[in-house]
């Protein structure tokens, strides 16, 4: 199954790859970023 790649738009962590998080980058944009 595909998962949200880096900087892929998302609504929640479920939209991102495992160990990635849906993080805000601005007022309304949420993008997948790697969780260390």
UniProtKB/Swiss-Prot annotation:
Family per similarity comment: Belongs to the neurotoxin 10 (Hwtx-1) family. 02 (AU5B) subfamily.
Tissue: Expressed by the venom gland.
Primary location recorded for the protein, binned into one broad class: secreted
Taxonomic source organism: Heteropoda venatoria (Brown huntsman spider)
Superkingdom as given in the UniProt entry: Eukaryota
Protein keywords: Calcium channel impairing toxin, Disulfide bond, Ion channel impairing toxin, Knottin, Neurotoxin, Secreted, Toxin, Voltage-gated calcium channel impairing toxin
S-S bridge residues: 3-17, 10-22, 16-32
GO CC list: extracellular region
Protein localization: Secreted
Domain-level remarks: The presence of a 'disulfide through disulfide knot' structurally defines this protein as a knottin.
Name of the protein in question: Omega-sparatoxin-Hv1b
A Pfam family hit: Toxin_12
Keyword Ribosomal protein found: no
Sample GO molecular function, one term: toxin activity
Known function: Blocks calcium channels (Cav).
Lineage: Eukaryota, Metazoa, Ecdysozoa, Arthropoda, Chelicerata
